Amino acid sequence: MLDKYSAKLSLFVDAAFLIALRQASSQNKELVSEYDKIAKQLRNLTSAGHDIQLHIHPHWLDSVYNNGWQIDTSRYRLHDFSGEKRASIVRDCKEELTEHSDSPIFAYRAGGWCLQPFPEIKSQLLENDIWLDSTVYAGGLSEEQGRHYDFRGA
């Protein structure tokens, strides 16, 4: 359908998952194939003119694969990490996506829409040449503990 209308997509790819998958694949051959399939799909998309941009669910960095993923969401938001660690997460995730695209990575969408308070993560994004945010949506609200956001003023 996209080709029919010459339409292009911007896809926000969870780079933290890709990093976790790549790391876990060193101990599980099945995961090598999964990573390779995703990498091929991303290369095909970018070769076709689609755009991939940065999406981060940092809880993947605490999750492990042991006959299935053991998901640890105790550090769900970038805000749950120190400023130095946030900077390395953003840098590593951007580098992961850069491996799959010749186009610049400059936009971000927060995992779980957990962007606030923005000043706490702004410098880490800017240090990595991430200058556009795609997280906020009109009227968005979550009051869930640890996963809160309030975009009602947007």
Could you tell me what each predicted segment is?
Residues M1-A48, R109:
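Active-site beta->alpha N-cap acidic-glycine motif
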Residues D3-K4, S82-W113:
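CE4/NodB-like, metal-dependent polysaccharide N-deacetylase domain
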Residues L11-A15, L54-P58, R109-G112, S134-A138:
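A cross-domain feature marking catalytic cores of carbohydrate-active enzymes
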Residues W60-D72:
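Short, flexible, mixed-charge acidic loops at enzyme active sites
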Residues P104-A154:
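Active-site-adjacent pocket scaffolds in enzyme catalytic domains
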Residues I38-R43, A87-E95, K122:
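Generic structural signal for well-ordered alpha-helices
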Residues Y5-L9, S47-I52, D102-F106, N128-I130:
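Short, well-ordered coil/turn segments that N-cap beta-strands
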